Amino acid sequence: MSSSDQNPAATPASSGPAEPSPPGRPTAVSSRVLDMGAQLAQALKPVRQMKQHACSFALYAHDLHRQVEVHHFVARLNQDVLQCAVYDSDKPSARLIGVEYIVSDTIFEGLAPDEQRLWHSHAYEVKAGLWTDVGVPEALQSSEMASLARTYGKFWCTWQADRGDALPLGAPALMVSPQAAEPGRVRGELVRGRDERYGIDSSAGGLKAARVEMDEPEWINPNADYWRLHGKGFAVDVVPAEMKRHAPFP
């Protein structure tokens, strides 16, 4: 199955587009007891490094008309590298739909051109008020947003819940960031729904106005946001391959 499949064959893991629920039995009491005990006994250090909850929107690289609200739970490896677990909501039942890696422009410029094509810029997404740390006053997050505007991200979606997949099916799909140009502009109803739910004002008089003086990158590498210049996206397909008989590395 390709990552660009619109309608995978009907399976118990396909339940329609609205709030797909994974197949399976209710969680047993014994499992809940284990979870509670493990929570007390284990440090869960990688998970506890997630310090921010950011909400934004993402588009499928092979079909920019498929647009989804995304929730990034962000861990900072250092000032130049972030790693984000991406969920479809911030509810307790949220699905882990992918992962995004974010790097500074300095690191991005050191990547090979073929690698850069898989990444997207964040400048418009930030300046337009689409990316925001939920519940954090703009005055507190403004410096972080200014830094983020100069970054690039690579986002793989592993669970296409928006098409009704009740489990992660097929190959990962590459995602891209919203842009000002069609067809990369996020639909207004998606933004309004998000803003109403969280009490956010991303209109021209809200976050956009607050960020209008924010410095923009001197340039955005043309290898990023590949579709804008080439009119094409990327999709992943799964093909059989010969297994390696010898270790590739010493």
UniProtKB/Swiss-Prot annotation:
Residues 8-18 have a biased composition (Low complexity). Residues 1-29 are annotated as: Disordered. Belongs to the OBAP family. This is Oil body-associated protein 2B. It comes from Zea mays. It comes from the Eukaryota. The lineage of its organism: Eukaryota, Viridiplantae, Streptophyta, Embryophyta, Tracheophyta. It holds the Pfam family DUF1264. PANTHER family: OIL BODY-ASSOCIATED PROTEIN 2B (PTHR31360:SF17), PTHR31360.
